[in-house]
From Swiss-Prot:
This is Preprotein translocase subunit SCY1, chloroplastic. It is a multi-pass membrane protein. It comes from Arabidopsis thaliana (Mouse-ear cress). GO terms for biological process: protein transport; thylakoid membrane organization. GO terms for cellular component: chloroplast; chloroplast thylakoid membrane. Disulfide bonds: none annotated. The lineage of its organism: Eukaryota, Viridiplantae, Streptophyta, Embryophyta, Tracheophyta. The chain crosses the membrane at residues 142-162, 192-212, 241-261, 268-288, 295-315, 328-348, 382-402, 415-435, 482-502, 503-523.
């Protein structure tokens, strides 16, 4: 690795003599005391030998050489075969005091990759300017993202015909589970838009296939052993199943609207079910196109947009209720709780467990020891917002089936599972814990991780490769999933506790789970944007610029 050292005196540069003499014994007596090298556009870390501990970055855009244009031979070590006069040597020594000297740990070309690693480290550690957002394909991707999100919101404002919307909205405020689903749809259910089903049928289809993968070994092999091709097949099956779920939920919603329909006929039912199904398919398609942009998960971003659009109305109702009742203390408690909730979510979302790794063939260029920066990161909440989305959709399923079938037992179950019901909180916590544990091991299979580490020549200290490593990773993930489940359970139970303290229920539709979705999607998108910018910086760097050294 090429380092940059600051020389404090003329004699300090004599330490280069021993290392360079091994390369060329014949020219060792002709070495200059302080040689200036040709520098390509590298970003390399520096360290001072005396009284300097802070690292700093050097951006070298000029070709520096101790001689004039006569030096046309590739000479990266500064070994000049010509003798120089004493006056020239004194002058170059004076220049070396004013500029840093470049020292290479070895003179062969095998050190070039370590120089490239210096560039990579400098790129990853460098700050991102605001102007970087307007370079490369990133602006075009953001425009496409905004266009897709605007198109998904447009379907919310195209209503179904023949429905008394005012009467339906009045009944919607009294139904907690529909209010929660209305949050995920961005007010689409209340507005009776053709895209009011949103992404919920696709999420239900995902839940069903993930559960079926544990029952049918063929699906599990298709998901894990066949790689990307198998996952594409499961995604295709999920799309087909989402259409079926959309038809079922559309029929249930249409029959639920029967008391509010002016002319409830067969033609109206068929047309409404068709429009709602097509709206759900369109939303699912938009979500997949958003995922293809690699700026975040399409499903999460659609729900993120819906919650953001629902936030002003929800907060306005809460404020109006507090002002009407004179409950200023309760309003302040909600605001403080919201801020603390956001801080806690950000803290937990960024927390991770780092497991150190040892590589059999990865050494540092100077010390010759194992690289210390290699580790395996496991996030505390690695499942993200998906367990909450799955849990909410599962709790809404009995109410949908009850509206469709009219069975009294399902109505009782749906009533018990609504927010504020007797079984809502414990069932929600159990479902969140189950989906969090399941989704954690679905994303990170300990056997697969152990096999990949073994192929890469990596091992965990004091743990044998193979089954012992898989068991160790499984234990770590199990403990982390417990912490993540406890965190998600606090989010699920927190709003209910705040409601009991403040006696304000209008804020129920915007719960802690919604805040987690907002923060999770925002941090994930910010991370993807940062990765995109770093990728563009890598594309603009040439690690091997040997052409300009040719005579």
């Amino acid at each position: 690795m090429i380092t940059v050292s600051e020389v404090s005196s003329y004699s300090s540069s004599s330490s280069n003599f021993a290392s360079l003499s091994r390369l060329n014994h014949k020219s060792s007596s002709r070495l200059r005391s302080s040689s200036l090298y040709k520098g390509s556009f590298f970003s390399v870390s520096t360290k001072t030998r005396r009284n300097t501990c802070k690292a700093k970055s050097w951006n070298l855009g000029l070709v520096i050489n101790s001689r004039s244009s006569e030096a046309s031979v590739f000479d990266p070590l500064g070994i000049n075969p010509d003798e120089t006069s004493g006056l020239s040597s004194i002058w170059e020594s004076f220049v070396s005091l004013l500029s840093p000297s470049f020292e290479s740990s070895s003179g062969n070309r095998r050190d070039k990759p370590s120089s490239g690693r210096g560039v990579a480290a400098a790129i990853e550690d460098s700050s991102i300017d605001f102007g970087d957002f307007f370079k490369g394909p990133l602006p075009g991707k953001f425009l496409k993202l905004l266009g897709f999100l605007a198109l998904s919101r447009l379907g919310i404002y195209i209503p179904l015909g023949g429905v008394n919307r005012e009467a339906f909205v009045g009944n919607l405020d009294q139904n907690s589970i529909l209010s929660t689903l209305d949050t995920f749809s961005g007010g689409g259910i209340g507005r009776l838009g053709i895209c009011s089903l949103g992404i919920v049928p696709f999420i239900n289809a995902q839940i069903v296939f993930q559960l079926l993968a544990q029952v049918y070994p063929k699906l599990q092999d298709l998901q894990k052993k066949e790689g990307e091709a198998g996952r594409k097949k499961i995604l295709q099956y999920t799309r087909y199943a989402s259409v079926g779920f959309a038809i079922v939920q559309a029929i249930g919603q249409v029959f639920y609207l029967r008391p509010y329909v002016n002319d409830f006929s067969t033609e109206w039912v068929v047309s409404s079910v068709t429009l709602l199904t097509l709206g759900s398919v369109l939303t699912t398609y938009i979500g997949e196109r958003i995922s293809d942009l690699k700026l975040g998960n399409g499903t999460s971003l659609l729900i993120f947009t819906s919650i953001i659009s629902y936030l002003p109305a929800s907060f306005g109702r809460t404020t109006a209720e507090a002002l009407q009742e004179g409950n200023y203390t309760g309003l302040g408690t909600i605001v403080v709780s919201f801020l603390l909730l956001v801080l806690g979510i950000v803290y937990v979302q960024e927390a991770e467990r780092k497991i150190p790794l040892n590589y059999a063939s990865r050494y540092t260029s100077k010390a010759g020891g194992l690289q210390k920066s290699a580790y395996l990161p496991f996030k505390v909440n690695s499942a993200g917002v998906m367990p909450i989305i799955f849990s909410t959709s599962s709790l809404a399923l009995p109410a949908t089936l009850a509206r469709f079938t009219g069975i009294s037992a399902l109505k009782n179950v749906a009533f018990a599972l609504t927010p504020g019901g007797s079984f809502y909180l414990p069932t929600n916590i159990l479902l969140i814990a189950f989906f969090n544990y399941y989704y954690t091991f679905l994303q990170l299979d300990p056997d697969d991780v152990s096999e990949q580490l073994k192929r890469q020549g990596a091992s965990i200290p004091l743990v044998r490769p193979g089954k012992s490593t898989a068991l160790f990773i499984k234990t770590v993930l199990g403990r982390i999933s417990v912490l993540g489940s406890a965190f998600l359970a606090v989010l699920a139970a927190g709003p209910a506790v705040v409601e009991q303290i403040t006696h304000l229920t209008a804020f129920r539709g915007f719960a802690g789970t919604s805040v987690l979705i907002l923060v999770g999607c925002a941090t994930d998108t910010a991370r993807k944007v940062q990765a995109e910018i770093i990728s563009q910086k890598y594309k603009n760097i040439e690690f091997y610029e040997l052409d300009k050294y040719d005579p």
